Amino acid sequence: MATFVSELEAAKKNLSEALGDNVKQYWANLKLWFKQKISKEEFDLEAHRLLTQDNVHSHNDFLLAILTRCQILVSTPEGAGSLPWTGGSAAKPGKPKGKKKLSSVRQKFDHRFQPQNPLSGAQQFVAKDPQDDDDLKLCSHTMMLPTRGQLEGRMIVTAYEHGLDNVTEEAVSAVVYAVENHLKDILSSVVSRRKAYRLRDGHFKYAFGSNVTPQPYLKNSVVAYNSLIESPPALSAPFAGQNPASHPPPDDAEQQAALLLACSGDTLPASLPPVNMYDLFEALQVHREVIPTHTVYALNIERIIMKLWHPNHEELQQDKVHRQRLAAKEGLLFC
């Protein structure tokens, strides 16, 4: 692991020295490429414009090092992540620099300007199924959590923008756990607005959607509901082999469940439709503390509002006419 880190830092240092005053523009283009705002070819063209002919290899070396760092835990084929360039490339070990290399570059340069059919190198258009497109790596496209390699790549780019040299494995693990817990908080806030739940220690929510609800017309129901033994009392000196946070005995738990069932209502709550954007919008408005950052909160609320939809009067009228026609057609068939 230390070898990959040293290679990445060395490649970054060489690239920064080759770029000079253009290093900020290069980091901005790299961030756009990671966000898929620009394509790989456009990023290469901008990098070649900022670098000289002799320093283009530092661009390839840096990208190869950063992709290798992000894919350490994944087995990749040899040479993955290398960016092709028809000009100068990094000097290979065992091959000394000399006039032979310069002459080959001149030959390639002259060969590029030989007349040929421009359509011969055009890429043929092949229709692809959107589900089989593997180039989309954004979470909004894949509908999945970002992988560890994707988070590490984004963190490395952000660290370079703020003048940092590297990202540790502990920082990546902390961000992974933070993303998971953040999504759990959002889901808990949405479900708690739709289903009943119980509290433990005054703040921990559990037993979502429980059918056992207190009967308001029975005096003992509220008492039985509020006097549950949620955790055993803390022992000053637990015995050997005894877990101080163990559950209540099975007999006590069975008696509590029977008492709650006897004191609960007779009717079960009606089934709810699937969670939609309106439920998420209401949950974020009520539980404002789920997204404490105002900038992130305002941006996501705006996105949710843009995706809200409900039928207007014309659509409702058309649906009514359509149902009447279907009913009339079914009546004619029965006759």
Swiss-Prot record:
Question: Where in the cell is the protein located?
Answer: Nucleus
Q: Name one GO molecular function term.
A: transcription coactivator activity
Keyword Cell inner membrane on entry: no
Disulfide pairs?
A: none
Which Pfam families does the UniProt record give? SAGA-Tad1
The cellular component terms of Gene Ontology attached to this UniProt record, alphabetical and capped at eight, are: cytosol; focal adhesion; nucleoplasm; SAGA complex
Q: Which domain of life is it from?
A: Eukaryota
Q: Name one GO biological process term.
A: regulation of transcription by RNA polymerase II
Query: Which keywords are on file for this protein?
Result: Nucleus, Transcription, Transcription regulation
Q: What does this protein do?
A: Probably involved in transcriptional regulation.
Task: Please describe the quaternary structure of this protein.
Answer: Component of the STAGA transcription coactivator-HAT complex, at least composed of SUPT3H, GCN5L2, TAF5L, TAF6L, SUPT7L, TADA3L, TAD1L, TAF10, TAF12, TRRAP and TAF9.
PANTHER family tied to this protein: TRANSCRIPTIONAL ADAPTER 1
Family the UniProt entry places it in: Belongs to the TADA1 family.
Name of protein: Transcriptional adapter 1
Q: From what organism does this protein derive?
A: Bos taurus
